[in-house]
Amino acid sequence: MKPLALHGHERNITQIKYNRMGDLLFSAAKDTRPTVWYSLNGERLGTYNGHGGAVWCIDVNYDTTQFISGGADNCLRLWDCEKGVTLSKIETKSAVRTCGFSYGGNEIMLSTDRQMGQSCRILIFDVRDNMESPILTIPVDNSKVTAGLWGPLDQFLVTGHENGELCQWDVKSGNKLISVQEHSKQINDIQMYKDSTMFVTASKDTTAKLFDTDSLRHLKTYKTDRPVNSAALSPIKDHVVVGGGQEAMEVTTTSTRVGKFDARFFHVVFEEEIGRVKGHFGPINSLAFHPDGRSYSSGGEDGYVRIHSFDPSYDDIEFEY
């Protein structure tokens, strides 16, 4: 399995995301310029220039016409996906940590950091009215939001928090519907399964966990021996890929083995590790499965995005149960 190593960023990757068709791969890093690539051959199509700080979060809408990015420059930008021009800009009072398009593509969700005397807030904007003011503002009092996404049919939001809490929010009233505390440390990433019935979380407490979307019931746990930064569910097999590693400031040697920077594959049902993929020279910060399930990508602290296409033998891995 020889990966494509994409080097278009000067600093660490913060998030990567495929579009719905899987032909494009979007990446964000701390170097202010989100980038779009052809996922088939790794060719760089272009960059989205305009941010004045690290870009923490990105998302692309259903038909790949619009793209959003939020960053440490206290703003979220809505871009024309093809032309790379800014269509709209939302100014916030603190850094934008998470963002996402609704499935309908008409609303945008974002969350801001608790910093500089500002409290953490979840904001929802309507793309159709120039996004001048939010249609819903949800103050988050306890612990700041570190990961978030839309629930099925845009009925609610699911957010992961710095203290390990997982919450569900009603998008009409802004009320908190459910709150569970299954993680003991910060939730770094939440990714939905293709049919939105379940999602996987990645946490600093060295575990990734599977949850039911509607009830937030904890289903499975995937244990590692390092902080988990990202986890993604395969759309065609019962596999979950988990990535992380010791934080950069805690790594005292430069060996890729000592820091444990490989991506690990687990069986979704049995919670057993079934394989590892090495490669990154530093922790893995973001993972994404291709929508066809035949490849996956990882973005690391080393500034590289790596596209891994599975060998034909991957299809032969079967568990009888």
From Swiss-Prot:
Places the protein is found: Cytoplasm
Gene3D superfamilies the record matches: YVTN repeat-like/Quinoprotein amine dehydrogenase
Segment forming the signal sequence: none
GO molecular function (one): RNA binding
Gene Ontology cellular component list: eukaryotic 43S preinitiation complex; eukaryotic 48S preinitiation complex; eukaryotic translation initiation factor 3 complex, eIF3m
Pfam families per record: EIF3I
A single GO BP: cytoplasmic translational initiation
Keyword Protein biosynthesis attached: yes
Protein keywords: Cytoplasm, Initiation factor, Protein biosynthesis, Repeat, WD repeat
Residue spans of the WD repeats: 8-47, 50-89, 140-179, 182-221, 279-318
SUPFAM superfamilies noted in UniProt: WD40 repeat-like
Subunit structure: Component of the eukaryotic translation initiation factor 3 (eIF-3) complex.
Job of this protein: Component of the eukaryotic translation initiation factor 3 (eIF-3) complex, which is involved in protein synthesis of a specialized repertoire of mRNAs and, together with other initiation factors, stimulates binding of mRNA and methionyl-tRNAi to the 40S ribosome. The eIF-3 complex specifically targets and initiates translation of a subset of mRNAs involved in cell proliferation.
Similarity comment: Belongs to the eIF-3 subunit I family.
UniProt-recorded name of the protein: Eukaryotic translation initiation factor 3 subunit I
Protein source organism: Nematostella vectensis (Starlet sea anemone)
